[in-house]
Amino acid sequence: MLTRKQFELLRFINERLKEAGVPPSFDEMKDALDLRSKSGIHRLITALEERGFIRRLPNRARAIEVIKLPEFGINGGGQTRRGFTPSVIEGHLGKVRPHASIGSDEDSHDRNVAVPVMGRIAAGTPIEALQTRSHTISVPPDMLGSGEHYALEVRGDSMVDAGILDGDMALIQKNESADTGDIVVALIDEEEATLKRFRRRGASIALEPANSAYEVRILPPNRVRIQGKLVGLYRKY
């Protein structure tokens, strides 16, 4: 389980290692995460090391090695482990990554698609499904596949190891079916909506979190209705 700051720091270290071949300095990490002191970076580094995501090499300055990434990779640049690439759009003045076409701001805006925000989705304990359109977000078309799409605000931390954080906007492709391994919007008993990985287990359906603090839910098919598949994330920094 990673907190938002731990996830952001791990991603920053990994991206810097790929770009420059060396990890960032503690001052650079502090500035990147908008922290006031380096003591906060020390705590985050220690937490990442204890969880097995990084390793500090002894007797070497600025020597940090990334051992593993959360389940879907944190930089969005490569293939995923299980069929979903967590394409992330940075809100406001951020860059679009990794697949959106990049041109002038005006051209990019003209090509964007208005995706309706339909409420909130639980990445944790299921919450009551909300089906009221509140506003729209502007999404590059390369982030979306065919068919209809909508967005839901993520609430909870049960999918953090898949790179899905509390407060993210989940981009959902409407679909009433899913393949095993897909991350889906599942409606349980027509009352509760949750964002989980979908798997079939014999005659039952398993809704799996990406956080060891949460349990897998095993339900009969008549209690679960698929409402869409996750295709991307919109995140504000």
UniProtKB/Swiss-Prot annotation:
Q: Which Pfam families match?
A: LexA_DNA_bind, Peptidase_S24
* Active site, renumbered: 158, 196
Question: Any one Gene Ontology biological process term?
Answer: negative regulation of DNA-templated transcription
Q: What is its EC number?
A: 3.4.21.88
**Superkingdom per UniProt:** Bacteria
DNA-binding residues (ranges): 26-46
The top EC class is: hydrolase
Record-level Gene Ontology MF annotations: DNA binding; serine-type endopeptidase activity
Whom does it interact with, and what assembly results? Homodimer.
In its UniProt entry, what is this protein called? LexA repressor
From which source organism is this entry?
Rhodopseudomonas palustris (strain BisA53)
Q: Which gene specifies this protein's sequence?
A: lexA
